[in-house]
């Protein structure tokens, strides 16, 4: 995913640790009050607050189209925000309990994991219309996209698998067993590897995107819940929920090379593409 960390100190709701950066604006979801806070990435000041659907749980953006996509778990919709005007320009009905958001900027496709209906909704970014609904396994919680090979990787939390979707045909091409309760997933375009955070087994599974097989399992700290990949230095940052520690994995050796404290609730790490 090629992300780097940025810490901001602003008066927003930090109870839902998810954010996305676009055009030096950072979009942070506020699950408790059904809004998205927009923060200036240079000054760290709050720009505006945008009302979205009920219980927003995740956010991602397409830098090619300047669109931000927010999954609203409480009303089974996706809110589409124009990052140029910071206004909602579309509300898209999807499956039950939408959670993860994956984007292929080359194809202008948005992939939504529906944890409550065990499906993935495929949205055409040019029309804001769902063009396909793909059945996957139990409780798909998160998703990431390998845009170079047009494949989509879905973490199925209660089946302990990753579904691999062919983006051209919208069909399942492989199902890969991973650890206990995979909760987040990230694509490393530098080495063609997929990294899966397994919350209950306290590990990260590494999948070879060429063979769709697990080639490594890395022990980390307790309850790994978020994956962040920095392609500039080939490092994988794994946030461990239980002890607020980030495990840093060297993508070349698959070894944990550092453990870093996250901090308290007054700070928040934002992914910045």
Predicted regions and their residues:
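Predominantly soluble domains enriched in secretory-pathway, periplasmic, or organellar proteins
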Residues: 1-273
């Amino acid at each position: 995913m090629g992300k780097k960390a940025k810490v901001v100190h602003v008066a927003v709701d930090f109870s839902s640790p998810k954010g996305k950066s676009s055009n030096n604006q950072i979009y942070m979801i506020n699950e408790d009050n059904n809004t998205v806070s927009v923060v200036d990435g240079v000054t760290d000041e709050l720009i505006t607050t945008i009302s979205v659907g009920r219980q927003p749980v995740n956010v991602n953006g397409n830098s090619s189209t300047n669109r931000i996509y927010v999954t609203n778990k409480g009303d089974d919709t996706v809110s589409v925000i124009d990052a140029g005007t910071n206004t909602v320009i579309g509300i898209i009905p999807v499956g039950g309990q939408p959670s993860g958001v994956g984007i292929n900027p080359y194809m202008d496709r948005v992939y939504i994991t529906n944890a409550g209906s065990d499906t993935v909704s495929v949205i055409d970014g040019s029309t804001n219309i769902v063009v396909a609904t793909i059945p996957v396994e139990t409780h798909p919680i998160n998703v990431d996209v390998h845009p170079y090979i047009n494949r989509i990787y879905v973490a199925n939390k209660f089946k302990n698998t990753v579904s691999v979707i062919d983006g051209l045909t919208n069909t399942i091409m492989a199902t890969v067993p991973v650890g206990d309760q995979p909760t987040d997933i990230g694509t490393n375009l530098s080495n063609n590897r997929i990294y899966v955070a397994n919350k209950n087994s306290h590990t990260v599974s590494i999948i070879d995107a060429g063979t769709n097989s697990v080639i490594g399992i890395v022990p980390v700290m307790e309850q790994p819940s978020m994956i962040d990949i920095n392609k500039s230095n080939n490092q994988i940052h794994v946030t461990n929920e239980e002890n607020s520690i980030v495990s840093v994995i060297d993508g070349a050796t698959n070894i944990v090379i550092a453990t870093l404290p996250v901090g308290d609730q007054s700070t928040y790490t934002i992914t910045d593409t």
